C-alpha cells in the first residue's frame, strides 16, 4: 500500500489541475485581498485570513502540493500577516480582559481585573458565560482561581499562538487512538475479529454481505477506515473467487453484481462505521474541538450514544438498498464459504497472549472513555484522588498508548506490545491536516471573518432550521466527493458555528449533520480511501459505484438531518 500511495501522490502532483492550482491559488488569494482592501472596511486580520482560506482551499481542492503541506501554511502565513495578534497581546493594567482557563471547574471565559500591582484578583470576580446561542450571562464567583490555570500570562509570539492548534489535545487523542489501532493490526487481532464475526453471521449471500458490513463498521470505529478496508478486501476477494468456482451454473452477471455489491458495501460501511465514535474519523474530532473552542463539551460517551444508533440505522438502510434494490442479490447458499473462513482462522492459530493483552487494554480504555464524564465527578473518588478531575479523553488515550510500549508481549521475549517501527506508521499527514484545520478554525473565529461571512449569508425572515440542515448536508456531501473531508470540514464547520449564532439556534444542529455528511461521499473512487481501495480491486465499475453512490448520497441528504434532529434531541437536548 505504501508504494501504491506514493505513486498516486506523485501522479496527483504532476497532473494539470495540480500544476494550475499552484499559481491560481496565490493569484486568486492576492486578487481577493486587493478587492477586500479597497472595497470593504473589514479588519486587516480578517482580510488576511480570508486570503489564506482561499489559498488553502484552492490547494486542497487541486492537491497542488500534498494536503499535509498545505495544512502547515498557517504556521508561516498567520504570523507574517498578523493573524492571531489579538490573542497574543498581553493585558495592560487596569483593564478588563477575557481569558480562557485550563481549570476544569472554571472552564468558561473569565473576565479579570488587572490591578496596578500586577495581581489578578480571583475573589468576587466576574465570569462571562457564552451559551450556545451567543447570549452572555455574567456571574460572580467568590472562589479564587490559581494564576497557574490562566493561559498566556505573558505575551506570546504569533507562531506560538498558531502552533497551539497543532498541539491541541484532540490531536493527541487522535494519535493515541491511532497507536491503539496499530497495536491491534500488529498482532492481527483485527483480522481474527473480522473472520469470527463473518463466521457467526452465516454465509447466505445477503447475510454474508451484512456480516462483512457489520465487521467493517465495528473495526472502523476504532482503527482507520483505510486499514479496515485493507483487512477486509482480501477476505472478500477470496470469497468471490470461491463463489465463482463453486457456482459455475449461476449467471455471471449475478455473480458480478454480488462481487460489486460486496466490495462497495465494505467501502461504505468503513465510512459509516466511523460515525460511531470520536476516533472513527478525524472530522468527528474536528467537530468536537470546534465546539470545545466555543465552550460546548460533548463527552465520548455522549457521542457514542448518538453515533452508534445513527450508524446502525444507516448501515441497515445501506444493506437493504444495496442487496434488495440496487443490485438485487439472489444467489443460493454460499457453498464452501464457512470452510474458507475456518481455514483462514486456522492459519492465524490460537489467540496469542499479546492479542489477549491488547484486547483487555483496549476494552478498559473504551470503558474509561465512555464512563469518564461520570467517575471524574464522584465526590468519594475526588477525596481519595483529587487530580481525578483533570482526567479527560486525551489523557486516557495517551496513557493507554504509552502502556503499549511498556507491557511485554508475552511469549515473545524482549518484545513489547508496540515498537517504534510500528508506531512510525502513524498517519502523520492526517495529524498535521487536523492541526491545520484547527488553526484555520481558530483564525476564522478570532479575526471576525466567520461573523462577517455568516452575516452576509444568513437567510432573512423565518427559515425552517430543517431546511438549512438539508442544505448544509447536501453541500457537504457533494463537496467531499472531490475534496478531502477533513479539509472541507475545517473550512466549513467554523462558519456554521457563527451561522448558528446568527440564526439563534444550537450550533450542534448544523455542525452534526455537516460532520456526518463529510464521511458520506459514496459516488467516486477519489471521494474516500475505502472507495479507491475497492475500486482498484477491479470487481466494480465506475458506473456501478456512481449509480449506487448517488442513491446513497440522496438517502444521506434526507437521513442525516433527521437523525440529528430526532436522536440528537434525545442525547443532546437541543
Region roles according to the model:
Residues 168-179, 221-233, 304-320, 389-399, ...:
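Alpha-helical transmembrane segments
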Residues 267, 431-445, 449-450, 461-574:
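C-terminal transmembrane helix pair
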Amino acid at each position: 500500500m505504501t508504494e501504491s500511495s506514493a505513486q498516486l501522490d506523485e501522479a496527483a502532483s504532476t497532473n494539470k489541475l495540480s500544476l494550475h492550482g499552484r499559481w491560481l491559488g496565490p493569484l486568486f488569494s492576492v486578487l481577493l485581498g486587493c478587492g477586500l482592501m479597497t472595497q470593504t472596511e473589514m479588519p486587516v486580520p480578517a482580510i488576511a485570513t480570508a486570503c489564506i482560506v482561499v489559498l488553502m482551499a484552492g490547494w486542497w481542492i487541486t492537491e497542488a502540493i500534498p494536503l499535509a503541506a498545505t495544512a502547515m501554511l498557517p504556521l508561516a502565513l498567520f504570523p507574517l500577516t498578523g493573524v492571531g495578534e489579538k490573542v497574543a497581546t498581553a493585558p495592560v493594567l487596569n483593564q478588563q480582559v477575557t481569558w480562557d482557563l485550563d481549570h476544569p471547574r472554571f472552564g468558561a471565559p473569565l473576565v479579570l481585573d488587572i490591578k496596578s500591582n500586577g495581581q489578578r484578583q480571583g475573589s468576587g470576580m466576574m465570569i462571562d458565560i457564552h451559551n450556545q446561542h451567543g447570549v452572555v450571562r455574567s456571574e460572580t464567583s467568590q472562589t479564587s482561581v490559581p494564576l497557574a490555570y490562566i493561559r498566556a500570562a505573558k505575551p506570546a509570539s504569533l507562531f506560538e499562538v498558531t502552533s497551539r492548534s497543532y498541539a491541541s489535545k484532540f490531536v493527541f487523542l487522535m494519535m493515541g487512538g491511532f497507536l491503539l489501532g496499530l497495536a491491534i493490526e500488529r498482532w492481527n487481532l483485527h483480522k481474527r475479529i473480522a473472520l469470527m464475526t463473518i463466521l457467526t453471521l452465516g454465509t447466505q449471500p445477503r447475510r454474508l454481505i451484512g456480516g462483512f458490513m457489520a465487521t467493517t463498521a465495528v473495526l472502523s470505529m476504532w482503527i482507520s477506515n483505510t486499514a479496515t478496508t485493507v483487512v477486509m478486501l482480501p477476505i472478500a476477494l477470496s470469497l468471490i473467487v470461491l463463489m465463482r468456482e463453486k457456482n459455475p451454473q449461476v449467471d455471471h452477471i449475478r455473480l458480478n453484481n454480488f462481487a460489486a455489491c460486496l466490495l462497495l458495501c465494505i467501502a461504505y460501511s468503513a465510512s459509516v462505521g466511523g460515525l460511531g465514535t470520536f476516533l472513527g474519523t478525524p472530522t468527528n474530532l474536528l467537530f468536537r474541538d470546534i465546539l470545545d473552542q466555543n465552550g460546548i463539551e460533548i463527552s465520548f460517551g455522549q457521542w457514542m450514544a448518538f453515533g452508534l444508533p445513527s450508524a446502525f440505522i444507516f448501515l441497515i438502510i445501506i444493506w437493504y438498498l444495496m442487496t434488495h434494490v440496487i443490485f438485487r442479490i439472489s444467489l443460493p447458499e454460499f457453498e464452501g464459504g464457512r470452510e474458507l473462513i475456518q481455514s483462514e482462522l486456522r492459519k492465524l492459530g490460537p489467540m496469542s497472549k499479546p492479542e489477549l493483552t491488547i484486547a483487555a487494554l483496549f476494552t478498559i480504555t473504551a470503558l474509561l472513555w465512555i464512563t469518564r464524564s461520570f467517575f471524574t465527578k464522584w465526590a468519594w473518588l475526588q477525596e481519595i484522588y483529587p487530580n481525578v478531575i483533570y482526567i479527560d479523553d486525551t489523557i486516557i488515550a495517551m496513557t493507554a498508548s504509552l502502556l503499549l510500549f511498556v507491557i511485554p508481549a508475552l511469549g515473545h521475549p524482549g518484545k513489547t506490545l508496540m515498537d517504534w517501527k510500528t508506531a512510525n506508521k502513524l498517519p502523520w499527514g492526517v495529524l498535521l491536516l487536523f492541526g491545520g484545520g484547527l488553526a484555520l478554525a481558530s483564525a476564522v473565529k478570532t479575526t471576525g471573518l466567520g461573523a462577517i461571512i455568516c452575516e452576509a449569508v444568513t437567510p432573512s425572515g423565518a427559515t425552517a432550521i430543517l431546511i438549512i440542515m438539508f442544505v448544509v448536508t447536501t453541500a457537504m456531501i457533494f463537496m467531499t466527493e472531490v475534496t478531502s473531508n477533513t479539509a472541507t470540514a475545517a473550512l466549513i464547520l467554523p462558519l456554521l458555528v457563527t451561522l448558528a449564532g446568527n440564526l439563534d439556534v444550537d450550533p450542534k444542529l448544523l455542525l452534526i449533520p455537516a460532520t456526518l455528511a463529510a464521511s458520506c461521499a459514496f459516488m467516486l473512487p477519489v471521494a474516500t480511501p475505502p472507495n479507491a481501495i475497492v475500486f482498484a480491486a477491479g470487481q466494480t465499475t465506475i458506473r456501478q459505484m456512481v449509480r449506487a453512490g448517488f442513491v446513497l448520497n440522496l438517502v444521506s441528504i434526507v437521513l442525516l438531518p433527521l437523525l440529528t434532529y430526532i436522536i440528537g434531541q434525545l442525547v443532546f437536548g437541543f
